[in-house]
């Protein structure tokens, strides 16, 4: 995979360029210096080959700021990792001492290096290009990311210095045909006007004691799982990422709000790829005092929507806060499978460990039957178990429960606990199917919705949850009345 690193001093437009290249707003763009702190990764789809763009934080080697040392190291790591380097400067300011320092730092790496003279918003500013020659960089492209000027020229230059081949026409046509075919695929809809009579389906041919097993789906190439790490500031999300990857990819500090961007990190483990989304901590809106914090908070909500599975990280040494309850509510509303990671487990006393999880489940209804994993990012206790927990949860979500097993399970539930009689009638379930996988939903055909009580609906839902191991997987039951026959 071709990797392209964007480097430069603070506030020259690196994140704006990153967003232009990736065609979506991944990096936070703001006039405040130091907005980007960690390395951000995005996909570039312009060359016909897999390509990745790395956005690094603004470098100021003379600064004594605590974060600058980490940002500097992150930028150097990104430069060493990349195949092509883009040094971004602000053409309106001329060549600064920091620009010259970065050029001297990058030239000895002997990698393709392009100087991006950004913020050339007018023709007069474009003519200042002669100032840039003193840096000793041969390839120079003048751009204005604010006005989307000359981005195509930059892409062509990247393609040239990276020696990328021209895509063959046959391959492009094949890709177009494939995408058209995929859009034409659709699931057959259930008939809404006629249903077979399954009145006896729950009274014959089953054994309540017989265990249900879900057959696995046919083997397919494993998809890249998008995993969002969610939690309030300073609970250890970035430490968990660094522990899983065995390298410092996220800047860690005790100050809440160290992570500002959502950081996409692609990682391979046992033949499967995981895209970890390390999010900025979610806060109450009234405590968000500036635009950067507000954008970070909204990005956390977007990360939940993007993710296949959410990992909610909580601090074992602190009580469950209203922030975490809000996150749990968001995850549930988005119908996202999730796992609760209880971090800083090493700091708990043994006496508290025995009752902690039980007490925690009692604090919020969403935690009642969620999957929990006690970990320590500091000692790396149970960190590797996170992968197996994710895989297990994904396996349950991606394997559709066969219709006969759904019906058999519900038949057993009715056999154990009969619905109550309401006005001389009793609820009957004729037939049931798993309607969708993501989000998970079951469709039950019944005789009358007026005979279904909330209590019995809750009982049916718990039966399906325990039978098919749906813990940590929000799902819905949809009830549909069977049309009455007309003679």
UniProtKB/Swiss-Prot annotation:
Residues 2-166, 225-398 form the EngA-type G domain. GTP 1 binds at residues 8-15, 55-59, 118-121. Residues 165-194 are annotated as: Disordered. It comes from the Bacteria. Residues 168-187 have a biased composition (Acidic residues). GO terms for molecular function: GTP binding; ribosome binding. InterPro entries: G_ENGA, GTP-bd, GTPase_Der, KH_dom-like, KH_dom-like_a/b, P-loop_NTPase, Small_GTP-bd. CDD domains: EngA1, EngA2. Keywords: GTP-binding, Nucleotide-binding, Repeat, Ribosome biogenesis. GTP 2 binds at residues 231-238, 278-282, 343-346. GO terms for biological process: ribosome biogenesis. The keyword Ligase does not apply. The keyword Glycoprotein does not apply. Residues 399-483 form the KH-like domain. Pfam families: KH_dom-like, MMR_HSR1. Associates with the 50S ribosomal subunit. Belongs to the TRAFAC class TrmE-Era-EngA-EngB-Septin-like GTPase superfamily. EngA (Der) GTPase family. GTPase that plays an essential role in the late steps of ribosome biogenesis. This is GTPase Der. It comes from Chlamydia pneumoniae (Chlamydophila pneumoniae). The gene is der.
């Amino acid at each position: 995979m071709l990797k392209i690193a964007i480097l430069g001093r603070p506030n020259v437009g690196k994140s704006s360029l990153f967003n232009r290249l990736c065609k979506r707003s991944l990096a936070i763009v703001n006039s405040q210096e130091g907005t980007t702190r960690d390395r951000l990764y995005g996909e570039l789809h312009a060359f016909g080959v897999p390509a990745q763009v790395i956005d690094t934080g603004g470098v100021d080697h003379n600064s004594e700021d605590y974060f600058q040392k980490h940002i500097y190291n992150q930028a150097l790591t990104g430069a060493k990792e990349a195949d092509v380097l883009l040094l971004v400067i602000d053409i309106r300011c001329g060549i600064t001492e920091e620009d010259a320092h970065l050029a001297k730092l990058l030239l000895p790496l002997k990698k393709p290096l392009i100087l991006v003279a950004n913020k050339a918003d007018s023709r007069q500013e474009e003519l200042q290009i002669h100032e840039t020659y003193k840096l000793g960089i041969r390839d120079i492209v003048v751009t204005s990311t604010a006005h989307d000027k000359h981005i195509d020229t930059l892409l062509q230059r990247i393609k040239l210095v990276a020696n990328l081949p021209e895509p063959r026409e046959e391959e492009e046509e094949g890709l177009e045909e494939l995408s058209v075919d995929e859009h034409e695929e659709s699931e057959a809809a259930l008939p809404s006007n006629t249903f077979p009579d399954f009145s006896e389906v729950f009274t014959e041919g089953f054994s309540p004691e017989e265990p249900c097993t879900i057959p696995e789906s046919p083997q397919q190439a494993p998809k890249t799982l998008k995993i969002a790490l969610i939690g309030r500031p300073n609970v250890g999300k970035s430490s968990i990422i660094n522990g899983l990857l065995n390298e410092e990819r996220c800047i860690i500090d005790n100050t809440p709000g160290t992570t500002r961007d959502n950081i996409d990190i692609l990682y391979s483990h046992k033949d499967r790829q995981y895209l970890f989304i390390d999010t900025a901590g979610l806060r109450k809106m009234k405590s968000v005092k500036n635009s950067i914090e507000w954008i970070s908070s909204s990005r956390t909500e977007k990360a939940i929507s993007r993710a296949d599975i959410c990992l909610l990280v909580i601090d074992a040494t602190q009580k469950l806060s209203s922030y975490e309850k809000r996150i749990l509510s968001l995850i549930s509303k988005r119908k996202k499978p999730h796992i609760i990671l209880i971090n800083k487990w090493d700091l708990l006393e043994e006496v508290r460990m025995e009752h902690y999880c039980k007490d925690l489940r009692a604090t919020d209804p969403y935690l009642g039957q969620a999957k929990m994993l006690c970990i320590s990012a500091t000692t790396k206790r149970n960190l590797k178990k996170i992968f197996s927990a994710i895989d297990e949860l994904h396996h349950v979500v991606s394997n559709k429960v066969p219709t006969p097993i759904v019906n058999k399970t519900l038949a057993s539930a009715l056999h154990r606990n009969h619905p109550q009689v309401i006005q001389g009638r009793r609820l009957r379930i004729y037939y049931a199917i798993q309607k969708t996988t993501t989000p998970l939903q079951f469709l039950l055909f019944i005789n009358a919705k007026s005979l279904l009580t909330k209590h019995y609906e809750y009982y049916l839902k718990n039966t399906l949850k325990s039978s098919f191991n749906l813990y940590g997987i929000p799902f819905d039951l949809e009830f549909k009345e069977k049309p009455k026959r007309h003679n």
